[in-house]
């Protein structure tokens, strides 16, 4: 900030957008190779380069914000707008899945037996594992709010405790979801019901894994004293994202598990 007369962050040239794009190409190509030729080499390479890119990009952002002071209030305002727009785009992303589900379930075709769930499909009981999953995510929403309030009050110990609980609940949710998939009496290839169920809940599960990773990074940063009560936008973004994941799950539970069964 020494040689500039404005509060904006002029980012230095970075290779990470390019390596991120290339890793995305490798992952999508790798998925096709896995599906059609049962080879995971390209997918593994894509995932590895993606993880390395994320690590190094996050490292640079942490350096610029925490140690170099480039994230001024003006920059933080822009980042807030960016995160809001990102969450709006995610809402529209999931809207497509809900649209596909309701389009198929509200007027089932004769090929489905004229009913929903389609003939031959035995849906999961919404009062068993799905209800437990709902309780787990709602509890994690409470604990991350506790973490946020503790951070605002400067209570580092409680913030770390609450954040650890949130991460543990997120990982528990992922474990429950994996066991549910393993025991489900239908698969993704079982017509429109199987495809809408697994794609919608699967992408939500992916978002839970991403959110848990985001929170783990925040936990490690808080251990190293990176956040203060006035400067903690990285954690704030993670909390927003986690609440979004909570709300999407409530819609999934009511629509697909409860009403759809």
UniProtKB/Swiss-Prot annotation:
Matching CDD domains: Cyt_c_Oxidase_III
A Pfam family: COX3
Enzyme class: translocase
Topology of this chain in the membrane: Multi-pass membrane protein
EC number: 7.1.1.9
One annotated GO biological process: respiratory chain complex IV assembly
Gene Ontology CC, one term: mitochondrial inner membrane
Transmembrane segments: 16-34, 41-66, 73-105, 129-152, 156-183, 191-223, 233-256
Reaction equation(s) it catalyzes: 4 Fe(II)-[cytochrome c] + O2 + 8 H(+)(in) = 4 Fe(III)-[cytochrome c] + 2 H2O + 4 H(+)(out)
Mitochondrial intermembrane face of the membrane: 35-40, 106-128, 184-190, 257-261
Keywords: Membrane, Mitochondrion, Mitochondrion inner membrane, Translocase, Transmembrane, Transmembrane helix
Family, similarity comment: Belongs to the cytochrome c oxidase subunit 3 family.
Description of how the protein assembles with itself and partners: Component of the cytochrome c oxidase (complex IV, CIV), a multisubunit enzyme composed of 14 subunits. The complex is composed of a catalytic core of 3 subunits MT-CO1, MT-CO2 and MT-CO3, encoded in the mitochondrial DNA, and 11 supernumerary subunits COX4I, COX5A, COX5B, COX6A, COX6B, COX6C, COX7A, COX7B, COX7C, COX8 and NDUFA4, which are encoded in the nuclear genome.
Reported function: Component of the cytochrome c oxidase, the last enzyme in the mitochondrial electron transport chain which drives oxidative phosphorylation. The respiratory chain contains 3 multisubunit complexes succinate dehydrogenase (complex II, CII), ubiquinol-cytochrome c oxidoreductase (cytochrome b-c1 complex, complex III, CIII) and cytochrome c oxidase (complex IV, CIV), that cooperate to transfer electrons derived from NADH and succinate to molecular oxygen, creating an electrochemical gradient over the inner membrane that drives transmembrane transport and the ATP synthase.
Name of the protein: Cytochrome c oxidase subunit 3
Native source species: Balaenoptera musculus (Blue whale)
